[in-house]
Amino acid sequence: MASADTVSWTGDYAAKVTGGWITHPWLANGVSIDSRTVASGELFVALVGDRFDGHDYINAALKAGAAAAMVSRVPDAVEMEAPLLVVPNTQTGLSALGAGGRARSRAQVVGVTGSVGKTGTKEMLRLTLSAFGSVHASVRSYNNAIGVPLTLANLPEESDYAVVEIGMNHSGEIAALSELSRPHVAVVTTVAAAHLGNFNNVDEIASAKAEIFVGIEPGGIAVLNRDNPFFRQLRSAAEISVEQVIGFGCATDATIRLIKYDASPGCNTLTVEIEGNPLVYQLGADGLHWACNSLAVLGVIHGFGENTHTAVRCLAGFQGMQGRGVRHSINLGDGEIELIDDSYNANPVSMCAALELLGTSRPKHSGRRIAVLGDML
């Protein structure tokens, strides 16, 4: 059972926000949806999917140290003494926990969406905002109807900032997640031909991304890619509910304007202007796409009124993320190969960015540049 100084959920409060009931009193220090990784003291949520049923793993989760399990039914194999939170539906219950976590939080919340660059921007925000206070952010790419409420359910009450990644597969999804997370700042990294599966064209994607403004808090801020063809459409949607729009990019009227980008592996130099004030900084992650993401980060920092000079000092050590353009040196016989690993995921936009990065690379001894590509499935 969780100790009192680490408790994030009591059984009574969880029952109150979910409309459920508890079999026995319990205290939990977090929320988990995976019995294989549940940590001691966490509440295990028995989600049900097309190919799995978390109720089959309740005993495994409790044996691993879970403080309790949230269930919609009690399997015969579960002991009567087991600490449970019984709810009508565990997916709905998880969303209710997310809403409860958000309601008691004092954090300034940043919602991040976009066709590409969401996770990288979220990680840079996690890093830079930590210079100004405690930060809670989405794990990996937990950005859907499960990941967003899970992020909010695990939001510590004392966090100063929360960074919530918000993705989508269909229209209406971002609106619901925005209303759940209620961001103070909404970031749209870009709009492009990615995740087209349930959309007829990119215009529909732009409209879906604009749903992030639906749940924005009063006095909120929108941070938008000024160079994107859909900037005006997004700005019009944002201005219905936000107080300020911050544009980033190369455009002359961008609030956060990129003046110059000098690429050098592991130490890229950016010269920018923030409302006309010059700022020079280094960025460890390689590629112009990472540079653009860093401009969005500066837009958030500027919107919060924090010191951008302090923030950019964090970016020099940011080397990107595993599978997203990280460089590896591999010894091969008498020579050496530099591998740029961009294998995490792919869409036409991210593939172009990867090829552009490869194209600007300068192999030693006039070596060749080789692209190894797979299907986009």
Label each PLM-derived region with a short phrase.
Residues 1-96, 100, 368, 377:
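N-terminal leader/targeting and accessory segments in enzymes
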Residues 13, 93-226, 230-243:
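Phosphate-binding loop of NTP-binding sites
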Residues 41, 164, 224, 340-341, ...:
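Active-site flanking residues adjacent to catalytic metal/cofactor-binding acidic residues
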Residues 49-52, 321, 343-377:
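Active-site beta-alpha connecting loops in nucleotide-dependent enzymes
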Residues 75-80, 187-338, 360, 366-367:
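Acidic, Mg2+-coordinating active-site environments of NTP-dependent enzymes
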Residues 84-86, 109, 134-137, 245-247, ...:
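Conserved beta-strand scaffold positions in the cores of enzyme catalytic domains, especially
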Residues 94-97, 125, 129, 151-152, ...:
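Buried hydrophobic packing segments
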